[in-house]
């Protein structure tokens, strides 16, 4: 039975029973807390919460809702159970029928013969679960429907009780499972093996109201609802698997055609290799989800829903390339999935061209960078491995993201495939820095206001006269005051204000140099200037706080620059010019400035260059810069025409738009000559020492040098010298020999760590018999639960757990071992169970989750082996007691 027919039969069944057919809502709802619709009942929430009256004639409705869940994108393809898009068929009753009606409707549709409009499932292969205390539902299933008692299983709140996770409606639920047969797992119903027994329908009986609480089973039931409601959800894809007789959703009529096309495009074959199969499934799943997101108006972007779509599309592209595709593939994938989905969603036809355009555009943009980005990553990975490291630096991950458009998720995926980890914290730090810069740039452009028209009168009629090249104090008049973007006539003490003056000696931020700090003075009035921004290259806006007294429009005042600020800012700006000149001497004329930022005592200089600078090159640049400082060259400024400046050899930077009259800053004749409107020292010696802090890559072909100047540089070098002297004293080694001495110590440390690890393993092996001898007998299960010595990692614990489990393999046995990291911040723990214990019902993964809840940790795994990590070692005894209680209850 084709999927579109499964959908039609569902809708017809409930419409014939008096339900109103409700079309699927968009995947995008006007809910800021919801990325995508992720459950069939989401569009009906206002009715269940009592916020709106259900508009349906009989108080009942049915829908087949398209849903997207993207929390586990990385799991897609690894197993056949994860899908990012699915269809949830549901029927809903608002105060009409309740348990018996919901159960009867579901059973009838599932088991009625195909010729009578049902799905024709064998009743003998259907199992049901009910909530532990829901005798009513159990009785309906057994007495009314005729399901044998042995195929009705009772489960707890975690499995068979529903709520929205917040105070509001809740209630028990009953789930219907299909027995796929012995080749899929153990008999005994869904409580024993959910791999064999496939959940196909969940019936939620909303009859109570819950209170506060977290988790699935840690809240109080505070009363009954005035009306009892029904919310059910049947997985369309799961029913399709059964009715089409296939192993999983990837084999159904919805997704298998995409895999077939992928085989043709790549030359690979599905079903022969697990790694290749994962990529085939990624292509199939993500093609459908991506297409449906585009259908509902999502476009690729760098945030929110757009980022999810971009991530999905790029995973398709990369998976196809890894399978062997050499050209564009998106058009064929999208056309194929649209063909399979159009019978269920006819609106796809009228949006076909748009969907293709969005997907193909994204593919072409990404393909331009995928090859080079992948090559860059592979080079980095090879270098990392050859150095003995296992971590991709945050800066490398950031470069992939910032330069090649690789989302961090893709870098994480590539790293995992290469057996590497990623310094995510370092990446996030660089991202935060980038966002901070972008925000600062945006604020500088907007000058604090989205609407700059408020400055228009002053820009046109009263541009600021800048006197700061000639003097540090000016007699000025207050032309205007603004507060929160609104013009005011006067400002009181403590008020933040923007001040417009007729003339000002304070430099307004531009050309990479931050605005001056200073004061506005008038009698007892003191106004602290915290920043100066420029509007339209003509108007200086002084952002300030009235520290004492008051200020009014028309006041005659003194505007004064903070002399220390200006001096240190001039040092940094002139040092920037010297470093640029030194760079070009060392690296050649292609090392052209791409951006800069300088403030008192510090500068950041970006330049076009592809390779990482060597320590020798950095030393050369620093030496040439300080030689220029020591030479005490005059720093001259010349105002001339742009043509004349270029004829002189002055460098114009950034692709800026210059006026007819420009300012040239010349240092040491031909050594440095640039167009610049900033403030500078009179002689290069006034800069003081310049200390390079290092260099890094900030993008494709762009690198950055950071440096201190003046007093900051002196303080930095003093600290470096003190550090070297301290190390020399501690290691009893001359400072010139420190690198060799430290290298020797590191070699010894590595050897010692290796020896300690060997001793640890021997000690653990010796203790294993002691642990076995001390095993507890709990409900027939021999359990070893111990905290071993500090410093063991998860790998050590896993080895120990495996050894101990093997020693218990002749019966029902459980092992739980835990340690604590040397710094005391982490608590790794591992659990392992013998085959006999697993058959008894022991599940190591579940026990790991239980332990994690006591020690502020998390983890999981398989029934026979699982691991986790926490942080609170003090909770370990309570965690072990909880495990004992679980074993007692088996």
Curated annotation (Swiss-Prot):
Protein's organism: Corynebacterium efficiens (strain DSM 44549 / YS-314 / AJ 12310 / JCM 11189 / NBRC 100395)
Main location as per UniProt: cytoplasm
Cellular component terms per the entry's GO annotation: cytosol
Cited function: Catalyzes the attachment of alanine to tRNA(Ala) in a two-step reaction: alanine is first activated by ATP to form Ala-AMP and then transferred to the acceptor end of tRNA(Ala). Also edits incorrectly charged Ser-tRNA(Ala) and Gly-tRNA(Ala) via its editing domain.
GO biological processes: alanyl-tRNA aminoacylation
Cofactor requirements of the protein: Zn(2+)
List of residues binding Zn(2+): 573, 577, 676, 680
Keywords of the record: Aminoacyl-tRNA synthetase, ATP-binding, Cytoplasm, Ligase, Metal-binding, Nucleotide-binding, Protein biosynthesis, RNA-binding, tRNA-binding, Zinc
Nucleotide-binding is among the record's keywords: yes
UniProt-recorded name of the protein: Alanine--tRNA ligase
UniProt keyword Lipid metabolism, yes or no: no
PANTHER family, per the entry: ALANINE--TRNA LIGASE, CYTOPLASMIC, ALANYL-TRNA SYNTHETASE
HAMAP family assigned: Ala_tRNA_synth_B (MF_00036_B)
A matching Pfam family: tRNA_SAD
EC number assigned by the record: 6.1.1.7
Range of residues in the leader sequence: none
Name of the gene this protein is made from: alaS
Lineage: superkingdom: Bacteria
